[in-house]
Regions:
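N-terminal mature-domain "stem" immediately C-terminal to a signal peptide or N-terminal signal-anchor/transmembrane
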Residues: 1-37
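Secretory pathway targeting signatures of secreted, lumenal, and periplasmic proteins
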Residues: 5, 9-13, 18, 144-204, ...
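Solvent-exposed alpha-helical segments and adjacent loops
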Residues: 1-10, 16, 65-127
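Single conserved hydrophobic/aromatic residue that forms the stacking wall/gate
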Residues: 291-301
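Short, well-ordered beta-strand elements
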Residues: 83-92, 169-174, 260-271
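Signature of long, low-cysteine stretches enriched in small and polar/charged residues
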Residues: 39-42, 46-90, 198-259, 273
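N-terminal "mature-domain start" segment
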Residues: 1-2, 16, 25, 123-151, ...
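A short acidic/glycine-rich loop-to-helix N-cap element
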Residues: 92-98, 262-285
Length: 301
């Protein structure tokens, strides 16, 4: 099944009225950091009578129970594995809408993390074997075998995968660790990105190179992932002096073990194509790789 999809089990009338509207507003809202609007989750409604047998095998399920006292609960691997099942109960439209609201934050978190885990699982099924460039860089990166080394020097590696009408990319460079990663705000991170773009990411035309798109301010947040401190930035890139652009997902990562900061970025070029699932794969690659720097780092703390 497609990444970031949810099966919603509810009767057709409810789906086409306020209950369906509420679920769509909360779960099919805009996925942050993409150049075109794409929904956060792809929703597929299924009436109760169709919810049996193989149709219960979706990884993510929201089941609306209209005949019980108001509450919500989660079950893991209820009908299949892996699976996150959310049951929302109520005995009136109002009480069901309230429970949808109450469960939203936890549910989005669980579904999002579950899909990153699923993406990691897919990566590990067929990982890239040639990792010499990463070994030289002291980084244990896991990525699908469809990626190949595109460019490398002593401070920079660039992997690329061809996709329909474009390519998906991961770059890694090292920064000295004098500066705390959380001292970077959006403006100083953009400045850093643009200088790295000028040094390492040329466009197709002479004197052209990748920069952050000026029209849209990126989203930024602090992340603690398995004990690793990271600054996450999502936004869109363009090429100065050329007509190219797309989404990026950037992490500044504290690598205490090697006394450095890693600048790791995934970016996608695929004009007029949907890019949400490509960005989710890049996030999974980066997070899967970072778990491997966390183990020795944690031991040292």
């Amino acid at each position: 099944a497609r990444i970031n999809s949810i099966t919603v089990v509810v009767d057709n009338d409810s789906w086409n009225s306020t209950i369906g509207d509420k679920i769509r507003n909360l779960y099919a809202d805009e996925y942050e950091g993409l150049p075109q609007i794409e929904e956060r989750f792809t929703l597929k409604q299924m009436p109760y009578e169709a919810f049996s047998g193989f149709s219960r095998s979706s990884r993510n399920i929201i089941f609306i129970n209209k005949k019980s006292n108001p509450e919500f609960f989660f079950e893991v691997d209820k009908y299949a594995r892996p699976q996150i099942y959310l049951e929302i109960k109520g005995n009136s439209i109002k009480s069901i809408l309230e429970q949808i609201d109450k469960s939203k934050k936890e549910a989005i978190n669980k579904f999002t993390n579950g899909e990153i885990e699923e993406s990691k699982r897919r990566i590990l099924k067929s990982p890239l074997k040639d990792t010499k460039a990463m070994d030289d860089f002291l980084i244990n990166m896991k990525m699908p075998s469809a990626y190949s080394l595109y460019k490398q020097d002593k401070n920079f590696i660039w992997y690329q995968k061809q996709i329909q009408k474009g390519h998906s990319n991961i770059i890694v460079t090292k920064l000295p660790s004098q500066k705390n990663i959380f001292d970077y705000n959006i403006q100083s991170l953009i400045k850093l990105r643009d200088s790295i773009g000028k040094s390492f990411l040329p466009g197709r035309n002479p004197e052209s190179f990748m920069i952050s798109e000026k029209e849209y301010l990126p989203y930024q947040k602090k992340v603690n992932y398995y004990g690793i401190k990271m600054l996450e930035t999502r936004g869109t890139w363009e090429v100065k002096g050329d007509f190219m652009g797309g989404p990026f997902l950037n992490y500044l990562v504290e690598d205490k073990l090697n006394d450095r900061v890693l600048f790791i970025e995934g970016f996608v070029f695929a004009p007029s194509k949907r890019k949400r699932d490509n960005i989710i794969e890049l996030e999974a690659i980066i997070k899967l790789s970072l778990i491997h720097i966390s183990e020795p780092t944690r031991l040292q703390q």
